[in-house]
Amino acid sequence: MKRKSLVVLFAMAVLALVAGCGGASKTETRIQQVGPAEAYQLIQQHRDDPDFVILDIRTPQEFVAGHIQGAINVDFYAPDFKQQLDQLPKDKTYLVYCNSGNRSGQAMPIFRELGFREVYELKDGIQSWYQAGYPLVSGQ
């Protein structure tokens, strides 16, 4: 009886190790929603960090009308949106926003699926940023 218990215990230990090793190789995406004050702090902390990217996923027209300084534009409505995201480096940290939080909320599962390491979503989009009094720049 003891021998059977030891065999079962050993088999369970081996399965636990194998399962643990399998999960360790996949990078999990860290997604966090932040308000405008937290987003501003992130931008200030990473001002000179080439591994920090501000990503505006609104249309090019919305982007030109006003965006967060330093942001790059990838249009959520573009037919190749997912492919454009897939071309971006996955190991950088991203602050993502749209107009109201709707598009960025829909985009978060895509970031996860593509294996991005760390993504911050601006809650309620650029509207919340603007209403909080933070600056916007216009043009390209």
Predicted region positions:
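Short, surface-exposed ligand- or partner-binding patches at beta-edge/loop junctions that are enriched
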Residues: V96-Y97
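Structural scaffold elements adjacent to functional motifs in cytosolic proteins
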Residues: I54-D56
